[in-house]
From Swiss-Prot:
Coiled coil: none annotated. This is Putative septation protein SpoVG. The keyword Cell division applies. Keywords: Cell cycle, Cell division, Septation, Sporulation. NCBIfam families: PRK13259.1 (NF009749). It comes from Bacillus licheniformis (strain ATCC 14580 / DSM 13 / JCM 2505 / CCUG 7422 / NBRC 12200 / NCIMB 9375 / NCTC 10341 / NRRL NRS-1264 / Gibson 46). Belongs to the SpoVG family. PANTHER family: SEPTATION PROTEIN SPOVG-RELATED.
Length: 97
């Protein structure tokens, strides 16, 4: 399995989320709403999730081994850093009404 495309939107929030990504796997399957989070130990990728009735978050889709997780994280963070080198980046305002 290979990540064959990454689409990334940087976001401007008060929280720790820095971007939202969509990835394509093997030119055949897309996963949306992957988040780039600025954590205590640096940037990491959080898979799409939803809140359960008891307030916990559960992944909607996620890799089942560390090798695949590494491929996804590397592809998304490489695109995040590549876009960081671009002079003018448009940020999407999240949570603004």
């Amino acid at each position: 399995m290979e990540v064959t495309d990454v689409r990334l939107r940087r976001v401007n929030t008060d929280g720790r989320m820095r971007a939202i990504a969509s990835i394509t796997l093997d030119h055949e399957f897309v996963v949306h709403d992957i988040r780039v989070i600025d954590g205590n130990n640096g940037l990491f990728v959080a898979m799409p999730s939803k809140r359960t009735p008891d307030g916990e978050f559960r992944d909607i889709a996620h890799p089942i081994n560390s090798s695949t997780r590494g491929k996804i994280q590397d592809a998304v963070l490489n695109e995040y850093h590549r876009l960081g080198d671009v002079e003018e980046i448009e940020y999407e305002e999240i949570g603004a009404s």
